[in-house]
């Protein structure tokens, strides 16, 4: 196993202990101090994120496995996002499947029932390797989600050569629980017994350390965990059944027992008897038992008199469950094997790694002149790009209606919507923008929060909480670290502006290609919101198109610039425009003025028109009504924020309301049932082949 500890960190350990640590102790420290578990290179900046609010029940508190917010009627929404990037690059099926399993266990560790999954997938070009990665990632997610009966209700699928060697596989999960029944992940008192459910095997050895370094391609398959959704279903059902009988619950994720026990003890101590751990193979060494990341395991802190009843529930399913130790008052974590010490380290040492603040330097951005491209060529290239095609092939692999609570299904709108037990509608959306982040990570951080907020508004919802996942290259590289800092600053600023608390998140560094080049910065947010009033149900029909918001000539960091190069200006995020435009859309939904709507983002106005054209309708646009720039390419492909495209029978209402609110809204054209074509001013662009590509590209390419 490769240790990721630096020489300085190893000296700190030796100095604190006053001795040379044993091999097992080095592995223990390596797991707890890994970037994956400790956030040692990011924690200083993560503290700037707003994490409190009137509805927040549980937020970014140390060692809590998920955040929770009040959604009324005595219920709490539990929210979490995770990734399995490195494992998915090595074994995409199991890497993706175990990512789903892990996040489900994070949700049930709060005593919450999982009600919805989202998957945000980013892969490179669709060559043989890319096809293999994507097909197996999709299969892995579907295999686990479908088997345990949790619907995959939405997500993203993006293609960019920056992810050729290092795909990004993000999974988010929402759960629901009585707010008085939330279970903590940490304990407050000694004397509790540590109960472990599930077998421990050899898979996932050193997974936390593996996730905290660049991929080397050498002997890494053993660090990938193996998925068993049928065991996962037992874990989910029994954990929810016994949640009220236990004092704390923790998933055995990164770092295995080493991390779960130490974090659950939360500064107290623990004694673990490794010979009591149920093993899948008899020949596991004590050191491997400590750091194994075998899936489908949970750790419970239980009062002594409740141990037997807790384990009895698992044994009804012939599922292993054993009392393996206890929480102690002495602040020391001890792992024993048949009474002999294997590792014995102070809790403070394990929970207090030296924090890093690396040198940071903003990368010079070359402002290239804008490219001159024929409009027809630009339309074909942008509208046939894989990022904009129908993702039906992907979401058809998932059972998105299991549980019967899914209201807005994948492909039906900009946000997924599920019905909560109290009758309210919960909207969920994940957003990232690697192109904009590669140009300006600060503006990107603001923009992805604003886009998620707008996406929720398209179904009539207003955001109430978000979680983030910050995915970058090696933080020791100054340009990478500066992008990370800038992205956090942008996310923090936008979240504060919209009064949306960040209740959880994850940081994933060391995402690089085989040559050591970092991926484009890819921070991602997943926002949850509640529908205010009416729920929008999009339908395309004949009517007037209204563009809300101003279109600036901002083509740098867009899909257009990725395809054609060149640049121009980077889109500036104007949060007040996003807020006011979202308010107008929600008002329009509640007053019955909207038949179809979409936020304008990827692919610009042209990209927003594509779903209408794909339904067999014609669109006639007057470019003079798209105000803010005289550049026709800017009008069609700029990804300026604060904009919505609305289909309505009452365009005057929108123009009047927008004027009162201080923003722009103009009728820019009409939709007619006249075959798929785009008429821009006096030029007609047939769309039949583009529409055919829209529906056939993904399945045909695989």
UniProtKB/Swiss-Prot annotation:
Span of the signal peptide: none
UniProt binding sites for ATP: 39, 80, 468, 505
Gene Ontology biological-process entries: 'de novo' IMP biosynthetic process
Gene Ontology MF annotations: ATP binding; magnesium ion binding; phosphoribosylformylglycinamidine synthase activity
Residues at the catalytic site: 36, 84 (proton acceptor)
Positions of Mg(2+) 2 binding: 106, 251
Residue numbers binding Mg(2+) 1: 82
Pfam families (UniProt xref): AIRS, AIRS_C, FGAR-AT_linker
Binding sites annotated in the UniProt record for substrate: 83-86, 105, 225, 293-295, 508
Class of this enzyme: ligase
Chief location bin: cytoplasm
Entry annotated with the keyword Transport: no
EC number: 6.3.5.3
Catalytic activity: N(2)-formyl-N(1)-(5-phospho-beta-D-ribosyl)glycinamide + L-glutamine + ATP + H2O = 2-formamido-N(1)-(5-O-phospho-beta-D-ribosyl)acetamidine + L-glutamate + ADP + phosphate + H(+)
Pathway membership: Purine metabolism; IMP biosynthesis via de novo pathway; 5-amino-1-(5-phospho-D-ribosyl)imidazole from N(2)-formyl-N(1)-(5-phospho-D-ribosyl)glycinamide: step 1/2
GO annotations of cellular component type: cytoplasm
Localization of this protein: Cytoplasm
Gene3D superfamilies with a match to the protein in the record: PurM-like C-terminal domain, PurM-like, N-terminal domain
Keywords for this protein: ATP-binding, Cytoplasm, Ligase, Magnesium, Metal-binding, Nucleotide-binding, Purine biosynthesis
UniProt KW Nucleotidyltransferase keyword: no
Function field: Part of the phosphoribosylformylglycinamidine synthase complex involved in the purines biosynthetic pathway. Catalyzes the ATP-dependent conversion of formylglycinamide ribonucleotide (FGAR) and glutamine to yield formylglycinamidine ribonucleotide (FGAM) and glutamate. The FGAM synthase complex is composed of three subunits. PurQ produces an ammonia molecule by converting glutamine to glutamate. PurL transfers the ammonia molecule to FGAR to form FGAM in an ATP-dependent manner.
Subunit structure: Monomer. Part of the FGAM synthase complex composed of 1 PurL, 1 PurQ and 2 PurS subunits.
PANTHER family (UniProt xref): PHOSPHORIBOSYLFORMYLGLYCINAMIDINE SYNTHASE SUBUNIT PURL
HAMAP family, A to Z: PurL_2
Family, similarity comment: Belongs to the FGAMS family.
Name of the protein this chain belongs to: Phosphoribosylformylglycinamidine synthase subunit PurL
Species in which this protein is naturally found: Metallosphaera sedula (strain ATCC 51363 / DSM 5348 / JCM 9185 / NBRC 15509 / TH2)
Origin organism lineage: Archaea, Thermoproteota, Thermoprotei, Sulfolobales, Sulfolobaceae
Gene that specifies this protein: purL
